[in-house]
Design a protein with these regions (language model features):
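Gly/Ala-rich beta-loop-alpha elbow adjacent to hydrolase catalytic centers
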Residues: 90-94, 98
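Conserved loop-alpha-helix segment in the C-terminal half of the alpha/beta-hydrolase fold
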Residues: 202-236, 242
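Alpha/beta-hydrolase fold catalytic core
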Residues: 1-17, 38-41, 79, 84, ...
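Conserved HGGG/HGGXW glycine-rich cap/lid loop of the alpha/beta-hydrolase fold
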Residues: 6-59
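Catalytic active-site module of serine/aspartate enzymes centered on a nucleophile-bearing elbow/loop
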Residues: 228-261
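Flexible "cap/lid" loop of the alpha/beta hydrolase fold
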Residues: 103, 109-139
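Conserved alpha/beta-hydrolase catalytic His-Asp/Glu region
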Residues: 123-125, 142-197
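Active-site loop/oxyanion-hole signature of alpha/beta-hydrolase fold enzymes
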Residues: 34, 43-89, 250
């Protein structure tokens, strides 16, 4: 089972589950924990191979790596804790996992908050993935990861976000990074399906105005989805919860409270 941490509220029955992206860990939510635990029950988890979710030697060779199995990891924790329904907050690739969870287990999802959401891969990102596939077994993964974070978050005000992600990525093993990287071959058809299907689950997209690779497709998706809305944060990059944490916290806490009432 994944490593997880819970923070229980003395009065609230509302659950909020945080899902980080590739290369990160539950530590990426360090600017959210204090504020959210004042209002809700909070579940933080480390995805497979990330943070303190280290696989056993047996599981390293036997685990299946696809979006459904990784999504099931999350559901396993939720079921173990007997959480019937939760609001889900994700960042970057974590938003893809949340969307997949909502597709497979809609009865478990109260609402979705998608920070730095990935809805479509543009030509630039596809080029990056192609470059990575060629060199993933040759170049140290941390070099590749640094390169990726700089392409996605190139501006000077994105520096803290880059540093946080690289710090967490140092905890990954090379083999784990390669397995997660292989997921890229599955993501395009999955995203295409997500764009075509409106789940009608309340969804708030929180995007930085400088999230150059992913913002355009999210804007189009919001126009097509009947229960979706977009918070656009100007002068902000991909990792909105780190770069503009106060605005992120204020808006998302209010959103979750509204969706819970």
């Amino acid at each position: 089972m994944l490593n997880y941490t819970t923070h229980l509220h003395k009065d609230s029955t509302t659950w909020v589950t945080f899902v980080h992206g590739a290369g990160g860990s539950s530590s990426i939510w360090f600017k959210q924990v204090r504020e959210f635990t004042r209002h809700f029950n909070v579940l933080l988890l480390d995805l497979r191979g990330h943070g303190n979710s280290k696989p056993s030697l047996k599981r390293v060779f036997s685990e299946k790596y696809d979006f459904d199995s990784i999504t099931h990891d999350i559901v396993e924790v939720i079921d173990h804790l007997k959480i019937k329904k939760s609001h889900f907050i994700g960042i970057s690739l974590g938003t893809v996992l949340i969307r997949n969870l909502a597709e497979k287990y809609p009865h478990k999802v109260e609402s979705m908050v998608m920070g730095g959401a990935i809805m479509k891969l543009d030509v630039r990102f596809k080029f990056l993935m192609g470059f990575g596939k060629v060199f993933k077994n040759i170049i140290p993964y941390l070099w590749l990861y640094r390169f990726f974070t700089f392409i996605i978050m190139p501006d000077s005000n994105h520096r803290e976000s880059r540093s946080v992600l690289v710090r967490e990525a140092k905890k990954l093993y090379q083999k784990e990074f390669v397995k997660w990287f292989r997921l890229s071959s599955q993501i395009n058809p999955l995203l295409r399906f997500f764009r075509a299907v409106d789940l009608k689950i309340p969804t708030l997209y929180v995007m930085g105005g400088e999230d150059y690779l992913f913002l355009p497709s999210v804007k189009k998706a919001v126009q097509r989805q009947s229960t979706s809305s977009l918070l656009l944060i100007e002068h902000c990059g991909h990792v909105v919860n780190v770069e503009q944490s106060k605005l992120f916290n204020d808006v998302v806490i209010q959103y979750v409270a509204d969706m819970s009432s």
